[in-house]
Structures are given as C-alpha cells and as structure tokens.
C-alpha cells in the first residue's frame, strides 16, 4: 500500500499512522481535466484528502458502526464505543459487556456484527496478510462472509484501508445523492446513471467518490 505518512495520536488506541494515497495528486489532476463537477469541487477542499489509520479491524468496525446513519451520527456513536475497551483490538472488544455497547448507541444487531467481526480476527479466519496482493472482488468475497458485512462495507474497506483507487460503491446513499445533486439538479438517479457519470472518473472512482461525499458533508469521511 503506497502512501505518504504522518504520525497522529489517538486517545483510545496507541498512536496510529495516518496515510494518504500517493496517487491522490495524479488522480485529482485527471479528474479536474475529465469532469466538469470535479473541476469545481476539488479546488474547494485544498489539500484535504482521503486518509486511513491503517488498521483493518478498526476500519471494518467503523464501517459497521456507520451503516445506515449519517457521517455525524456515526462519529458520535464510534467515539462512545471506542471509549469502552482499553484498546480497540479484537480481544478487547470481545471482553465488553453487551449492555455497555448498547448504551454507547449501538443497535443489538450492530453489537452482534462487531462481536462476530472480532471473533473472525481473533480466530485467524481472515487472510489479512494476503489482502494487499488480492484483487478487489476476491477481498469482497472474503469479507461478506462475516455477519453484518455486505458489499457496501467491503467497498468502504477497499477505499479506506487498502486505499484501492477505482472503487465505485453504488450501494452508497451518499454517492447516489451526491451524483443527483451535482450532475442531475437533484433529480432521481439510477445505478446506471451513476455508472455513466463514473465513466469519466476511471481509473480514480474512489477519489471522485470521496469528493462527492465532501460536497454533501463538510466532515471528512473516515473509517
């Protein structure tokens, strides 16, 4: 995973490395040249870029917490949940009381999903060391075998942990709404409409998606 890195402290877990994809500047240059909306959006956000904390368990756990809620709501619940364990590690999560997890704002279903995720990591059921060499669809197939992880969550993982450059998460409500607002004056948008718009984004669909998200919510999306 090629990336430029800087150290950032985390109040709950040990210091992690924040990383931005090395391809970001190249992608932005391409998108500004190929797409009228990107030409308008990208300069609005200056040097801001996608960042990953580089931890696969945290990335997937945050994706589960963020399912079907706004970016702001997801951040609030995550902060409450992340304050519970001594460290955000699978073994620590498995020691938490269900009532405490529910009190943090997690639904019963999301609690089940997070526990199952932690068990998959602790049990060595995931090919974590092989992910960097696997293609997108192979990784998605492995991840969707975990309860609570569907294609959307797997695609968030590809974007935010592995920083794959050309992921188009068509199940993402924010992406569809953003395409509607930015390209179709707010009119309803189908998946085929979204695919057609994204033709100009290739091979940098992940980057364009990130800017579409930012156009809807000033709070950067992070997992």
What are these regions (language model features)?
Residues 18, 37, 41, 69-70, ...:
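Alpha-helical ds-nucleic-acid-binding substructure associated with the helix-hairpin-helix region
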Residues 50-58, 105-109, 198-205:
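Structural motif
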Residues 48, 63, 67-68, 84, ...:
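Alpha-helix C-capping/helix-to-loop hinge sites
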Residues 59-64, 96-100, 138-142, 174, ...:
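A general alpha-helix detector
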Residues 1-48, 132, 136-137, 151-223:
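C-terminal accessory module of base-excision DNA glycosylases/AP lyases that mediates lesion recognition
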Residues 44, 52, 56, 103, ...:
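Non-catalytic interaction surface on structured domains
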Residues 26, 32-63, 68-79, 83-86:
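A positional/architectural concept
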Residues 60-65, 114-118, 157, 208-212:
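Short alpha-helical scaffolding segments that buttress acidic/His motifs in well-ordered protein cores
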